[in-house]
Design a protein with these regions (language model features):
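Residues at secondary-structure transition points
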Residues: 3-7, 49, 53, 57, ...
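Actinobacteria-biased recognition of intrinsically disordered, low-complexity terminal regions
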Residues: 1-7, 184-188
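Helix-turn-helix
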Residues: 11, 15, 19-53, 57
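Solvent-exposed, amphipathic alpha-helical segments
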Residues: 15, 19-22, 65-73, 151-155
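Hydrophobic alpha-helical connector segments
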Residues: 57, 68-102
Length: 188
């Protein structure tokens, strides 16, 4: 039985992410990806012309999901409920994508790819803190939103916390995010 084009592409992206974790985006070559997959470099080129395209494709599903979280939150009338929806969605996304988040937080190569993939769209990274603070936020609230976002991402992708189970990590990330944002603790 042969692998389908989609299966190969998925394996390629998973392999690339694993190599990015070890070597960084800049330290990973197309040849390294091909070797790790057991295919030729030409087979990698069949799916992606450049490493930048691979890097963007690795980040794209999570960015698309984050954008959907923000779009859905925008339909919620109460600002407090929007904040809860965004924070819960972000925490869930971070916990499910720990390895990607770790690379994103530590490797400028993936950060550049994310910026390229957001080109021409309303920037998710601008919408995210704005959704947490609302339109009339003061400087303190804006700083708190950025600290909460950075903290959730950095802690969620921290190698020191990789052994923690998803449920426990998610609960703690949500609790800390709420405290930073001055939100009430979520009831169990």
């Amino acid at each position: 039985m042969t692998a389908t084009k989609g299966d190969t592409r998925t394996r390629l992206l998973e392999t690339a992410l694993g190599l990015f974790t070890v070597h960084g985006v800049e330290g990973t070559s197309l040849q390294m990806i091909a070797d790790a997959l057991g295919v030729t470099k030409a087979a990698v080129y069949y799916h992606f012309r450049t490493k930048d395209e691979i890097t963007e494709a690795v980040a794209e599903p999570a960015l698309r999901e984050l954008s959907a979280i923000l779009d859905n939150a925008a339909t919620i009338r109460r600002h407090g409920a929007q904040v809860e929806y965004v924070l819960d969605g972000l925490v869930d996304l971070v916990v499910r994508n720990r390895v990607l988040v770790a690379v994103f937080c530590s490797d400028p190569g993936i950060a550049r790819a994310v910026e390229r993939s957001l080109h021409g769209e309303e920037n998710v990274m601008t919408r995210l803190p704005a959704m947490l603070v609302g339109p009339d936020a003061d400087d303190s609230a804006i700083v708190a939103a950025h600290v909460a976002l950075a903290g959730v991402a950095l802690a969620g992708g921290s190698p020191a916390l990789m052994a923690m189970d998803d449920e426990t990590l998610g609960r703690h990330l949500g609790d800390v995010g709420r405290r930073i944002l001055g939100r009430p603790r979520k009831r169990d």
